[in-house]
């Protein structure tokens, strides 16, 4: 029974292989797209428009762009990346005159707060619960570590991420594809690439924060110390990028 359950476990990760035209019989570059997902997780679609969109590949529920696939000139696929794209900041909370602040260097900054109302079903009745949400400049308060409120920092540019995913499907060569990667909102994936000109490439991650390496970001860091803050993002060229390896 345990063996059967293990065989039915959800797949993890994916495989992608780009082969240079120098190594193929046809002389064309080849791209293997092998996402390890459950059977119904992604459907295959052909997206065509009169304005020139012409892409085929896999989409996840609700996506209007081809997540991994190809158009007439380029092909792209993604594997799950182990690049560190998320950190936790322990905040020092101070309450003054009924208002919440957090320590940041020598200053006290106000904690941002909003309220959220969620509706839920209780038997046949619909009920709702309203509760506060808090955040600092590091990100939303998501949990406590050592009895300290802890903010989770991550890529949160949903519109830019959507733009990058759509723009990716319209590129006709490496130059445009490489420029698209400069948007740097693909936070969870590596990218394997091939095109009709014979180019192949591998991009390890895309959204990679710059950090002070004197701190251990594998654990929550002290959010009151400005030195722990992210210092922007690494450029695509600063990350691992392999183009046409010999």
Could you describe each region identified by the protein language model?
Residues 1-246:
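Mature extracytoplasmic enzyme cores
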């Amino acid at each position: 029974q345990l063996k059967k359950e293990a065989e039915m476990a959800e797949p993890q990760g994916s495989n992608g292989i780009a082969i240079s035209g120098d190594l193929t019989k046809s002389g064309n570059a080849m791209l293997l797209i092998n996402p390890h997902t459950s059977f119904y997780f992604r459907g295959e679609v052909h997206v065509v428009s009169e304005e020139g969109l012409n892409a085929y590949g896999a989409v996840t529920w609700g996506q209007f762009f081809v997540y991994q696939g190809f158009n007439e000139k380029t092909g792209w696929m993604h594997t799950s990346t182990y690049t560190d794209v998320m950190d936790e900041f322990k905040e020092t909370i101070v309450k003054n005159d009924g208002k919440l602040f957090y320590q940041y260097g020598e200053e006290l900054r106000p904690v941002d707060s909003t309220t959220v109302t969620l509706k839920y079903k209780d038997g046949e009745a619909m009920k709702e619960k309203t509760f506060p949400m808090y955040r600092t400049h590091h990100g939303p308060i998501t949990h406590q570590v050592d009895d300290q409120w802890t903010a989770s920092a991550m890529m949160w540019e949903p519109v830019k991420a959507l733009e990058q995913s759509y723009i990716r499907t319209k590129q006709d060569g490496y130059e445009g594809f490489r420029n698209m990667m400069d948007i740097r909102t693909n936070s969870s994936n590596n990218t394997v690439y091939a095109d009709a000109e014979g180019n192949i490439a591998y991009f390890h991650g895309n959204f990679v924060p710059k950090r002070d390496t004197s701190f251990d970001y594998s654990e929550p860091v002290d959010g009151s110390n400005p030195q722990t803050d992210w210092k922007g993002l690494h450029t695509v060229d600063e990350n691992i990028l392999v183009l046409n390896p010999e």
